[in-house]
Curated annotation (Swiss-Prot):
The modification Phosphothreonine is found at residue 286. This is Cell division protein FtsZ homolog 2-1, chloroplastic. Induction: Slightly induced by gibberellic acid (GA). Changing residue 466 to A: Reduced ARC6 binding and abolished CDP1/PARC6 binding. SMART domains: Tubulin, Tubulin_C. The lineage of its organism: Eukaryota, Viridiplantae, Streptophyta, Embryophyta, Tracheophyta. The keyword Ubl conjugation does not apply.
C-alpha cells in the first residue's frame, strides 16, 4: 500500500521531509508539502523520510548509529529510521495508548512478488482421496504450486501437512465436520453451501487442478461443484480423478461413473486414472496400502508433469498461454507415464509412456499433446531428440504439441516422461460419437493391448508393431 502525505501536513521539526533516494515535489511558500506519490523501486511503495544533513555519517558505520541515538527528532519519530531502512519496522505510537500501554504498530508492508507474470497454480484435493494425493505431493517436496484440501471430515483435515489456512472445511452446517458418509449428494450440497469461501480460495488463480478419488461422498459430489466455480471464474481448470478398484464394490463404481460425468461437464480437461489399470503395474504380492499409494503417486506425476512445464525454467521455454491453448475446453484426456534407465533410457521412457496401462486408447486420435521429459544434469540433446521421435512419429501431423524439458539433478541416470493427450471429446463429437463409446470400445479390446514395458519384471523394452511399420521420422535428427 502506498503512503500519502497530506498537502495540509506541516512537519513539527524545522527540517524538511523528503523522499529517500528520490526526487520530491518542491514545497509551497507556506512551508507545506505537496502530495508525494513516489514509488520505491525495490519495494514498490511510497516512502517518506527526513532529509539527511550534509554531515550525515556513512550508513552502517558505528558513528551513524551513535548520531541516530543522540538525535531527539529520530527518537520522537522512529518511523523515519524505519523508512530509511534503519532499525526495525516496529514502531511504538505514543499517541495511541490503551490500558496496557502504548500501541505497537508494524509498518512493514508485504513485498511485491519477484515476478508478477508468474502463473499462479493451485492444486485442490477434494475429499479423502484427493487430500491423500495432495499430502503425497507435499511429501515429495513438489514446488511451484499452492496446495489446498477441501473436505467435510474435519478430523481427516487435521492430519494433513497442508497449511492450516489452506484447509477448507465445507458444509459446516450440513455435516458438522463429520463427513459425507459416502453420499455424493451430501458432498455436493456441502460445496454449494460453502460457495463463497470456495470462491475466495480460488481467487487469483490462473490454473487449478481439482484432484479427487471418485466413488465416495465428498470427492464425488463436491469436486464437480468446485471445478464449476473455478471455470466460471475464468480459471483454466483441470480435473484429475481416480476410479475405484473393483474390489471396492459396485456401489462405489456406479457413483464414480456418475461423478465423472458431472466433473467432465465442469472442467476444461479431465484426466481419469482407473485404479484397476494399476493392477497391471504391480506384482501379485503388492500390499493394498502400496496399491493405493501408487494411485496417489500417479496423480502426483500427472500434476507435476503439467505444472513443471509452466513453473520450472527448462531447456525449452513454454508459456502458460501455450498450455492453455491446448488444455482449454479440451474435454476428456489421457495420461501416460514412462521412466527408464540405461543407454537408451530416453527412447525407452517414451515407449513406456505411450504404452502406459493408463492409456485406454492410442494417442493417435488426440488433437493436442502436452509432454514433458525430465532428466538429470547428464540429459543430452540427443536423448531429447530420441524421445521426441517416438512421440512425434505416432501422433497426428496436425495435432498441436507442447513440449517441455526439465533438468532435475536428483534424477541422475534416469529419464522420466509424462504425456497428456487431449482433444478426444471434440474429435469424437465431430464424428457423431461420444467419448464414453470410444472408451467402451477401447475397454472391450483392452485385453489385446500390450502392457507397458516399464512394468515388466524383466525390464526389457519391445518396440510395438505400429512403430515398426512407421517410415522415416518427421522429427529432425540431431
Amino acid at each position: 500500500m502506498a503512503t500519502y502525505v497530506s498537502p495540509c501536513f506541516t512537519p513539527s521539526d524545522s527540517r524538511l521531509l523528503t523522499v529517500l533516494r528520490k526526487n520530491v515535489l518542491p514545497e509551497n511558500h507556506l512551508g507545506r508539502l505537496n502530495s508525494i506519490r513516489t514509488i520505491d523501486s525495490k519495494k514498490n511503495r511510497v516512502v517518506v523520510a527526513a532529509q539527511k544533513s550534509e554531515s550525515s555519517p556513512i550508513r552502517n558505520s558505528p558513528r551513524h548509529y551513535q548520531s541516530q541515538a543522540q538525535d531527539p527528532f529520530l527518537n520522537l519519530h522512529p518511523e523515519i529510521s524505519m523508512l530509511r531502512g534503519e532499525g526495525t519496522s516496529t514502531i511504538v505510537n505514543p499517541r495511541k495508548e490503551t490500558s496496557s500501554g502504548p500501541v505497537v504498530e508494524d509498518f512493514e508492508e508485504p513485498s511485491a512478488p519477484s515476478n508478477y507474470n508468474e502463473a499462479r497454480i493451485k492444486v485442490i484435493g477434494v475429499g479423502g482421496g484427493g487430500s491423500n494425493a495432495v499430502n503425497r505431493m507435499i511429501e515429495s517436496e513438489m514446488s511451484g504450486v499452492e496446495f489446498w484440501i477441501v473436505n467435510t471430515d474435519i478430523q481427516a483435515m487435521r492430519m494433513s501437512p497442508v497449511l492450516p489456512d489452506n484447509r477448507l472445511q465445507i458444509g459446516k452446517e450440513l455435516t458438522r465436520g463429520l463427513g459425507a458418509g459416502g453420499n455424493p449428494e451430501i458432498g455436493m450440497n456441502a460445496a454449494r453451501e460453502s460457495k463463497e469461501v470456495i470462491e475466495e480460495a480460488l481467487y487469483g488463480s490462473d490454473m487449478v487442478f481439482v484432484t479427487a478419488g471418485m466413488g465416495g461422498g465428498t470427492g464425488t459430489g463436491a469436486a464437480p461443484v468446485i471445478a464449476g466455480i473455478a471455470k466460471a471464474m475464468g480459471i483454466l481448470t483441470v480435473g484429475i480423478a481416480t476410479t475405484p478398484f473393483s474390489f471396492e464394490g459396485r456401489r462405489r463404481t456406479v457413483q464414480a461413473q456418475e461423478g465423472l460425468a458431472s466433473l467432465r461437464d465442469n472442467v476444461d480437461t479431465l484426466i481419469v486414472i482407473p485404479n484397476d489399470k494399476l493392477l497391471t503395474a504391480v506384482s501379485q504380492s503388492t500390499p493394498v496400502t502400496e496399491a493405493f499409494n501408487l494411485a496417489d503417486d500417479i496423480l502426483r506425476q500427472g500434476v507435476r508433469g503439467i505444472s513443471d512445464i509452466i513453473t520450472i525454467p527448462g531447456l525449452v521455454n513454454v508459456d502458460f498461454a501455450d498450455v492453455r491453448a491446448i488444455m482449454a475446453n479440451a474435454g476428456s484426456s489421457l495420461m501416460g507415464i514412462g521412466t527408464a534407465t540405461g543407454k537408451s533410457r530416453a527412447r525407452d521412457a517414451a515407449l513406456n509412456a505411450i504404452q502406459s496401462p493408463l492409456l485406454d486408447i492410442g494417442i493417435e486420435r488426440a488433437t493436442g499433446i502436452v509432454w514433458n521429459i525430465t532428466g538429470g544434469s547428464d540429459l543430452t540433446l540427443f536423448e531429447v531428440n530420441a524421445a521426441a521421435e517416438v512421440i512425434y512419429d505416432l501422433v497426428d501431423p496436425t495435432a498441436n504439441l507442447i513440449f517441455g524439458a526439465v533438468v532435475d539433478p536428483a534424477l541422475s541416470g534416469q529419464v522420466s516422461i509424462t504425456l497428456i493427450a487431449t482433444g478426444f471429446k471434440r474429435q469424437e463429437e465431430g464424428e457423431g460419437r461420444t467419448v464414453q463409446m470410444v472408451q467402451a470400445d477401447a475397454a472391450s479390446v483392452g485385453a489385446t493391448r500390450r502392457p507397458s514395458s516399464s512394468f515388466r519384471e524383466s525390464g526389457s523394452v519391445e518396440i510395438p508393431e505400429f512403430l515398426k511399420k512407421k517410415g522415416s521420422s518427421r522429427y529432425p535428427r540431431v
